[in-house]
Amino acid sequence: LNELIDFNVSSDRSGNSQPVRGLLAIESGGRSGSIAWDGSGLPPHLIALDPAKRSAVTLASAIAEVIARSRHEGIPIDCVAVNVGPGSFTGIRIGVTTAKTLAYALSCRLIAVDALAVAAGILFDRQPAVATACVALNAYRQQLFVATWQRNDWQNAFQDNSHAAADEVWPAERWHNLAAITTDASVCFAAEPSVTRFRDDTDCAMPNCQSIAGTVQTLEITAEDVAQFAWRLVQHAHFVPALDCNPNYLRDSAAEEKLR
């Protein structure tokens, strides 16, 4: 692995103005993590992590595979992109820590990617006629991480890297009921699969929650989606110093709330 890393190390850790040729993306905020390698002009290579194993175990081997692939293709890893949240506390923490360490070790640049903004982008790509996207990720404890975006505002936010400003925490019931009563065809709701099951989940029973069957699209963020989003931030040079990249948990953990 050290030999593979040596191939990727550049001469300037402090600030590199060279074009990004190869990007490694990390997605660990959901139930199924993944790693993606996206070299200039080549089809992205996605590695799905085994959900039955701990991310800390599977990330290392997947990253080693990507580094080997970049060496074989002769394209160094110039940038690491990572989903910084919101999402699973443990998954986000592992992903961000891995990305920071890797970016520092490879002397490459780092892009911090907002999970809800990626989700909105997936929906906008999937539905070209949709003007407004309201996306949700599972925050557990009958809560959701939510962001609502107008298409033009979402696109303009790349200029100042302000996507995270739209992130909110909602009661799950509020989002479900809004999705159930919205009839405007230009507004689309989408969420990860576990969110659409909330109403019937005995662990998250919400008797006052209206059915959203057939009204909400499901989506799952992959590292390839993270990479696609990151390339747009690369165009605006929104790089983060490796040691300054932090998770966006958006709220306290259950343990932290008990201490308050």
Protein language model regions, located:
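A general structural signal for well-ordered alpha-helical segments in protein cores
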Residues: 56-60, 99, 223-227
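Stable alpha-helical structural segments in soluble proteins, enriched in small hydrophobic residues
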Residues: 66-70, 105, 123, 223-234
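Phosphate-handling active-site elements
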Residues: 70-77, 103-113, 128-131
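N-terminal beta-alpha supersecondary unit
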Residues: 2-86, 220
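DPxDG-like acidic metal-binding loop motif
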Residues: 81-110, 115
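Surface "functional belts" at beta-alpha junctions
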Residues: 3-6, 16-21, 48, 54, ...
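Glycine-rich phosphate-binding/hydrolytic loop that grips phosphoryl groups
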Residues: 218-247
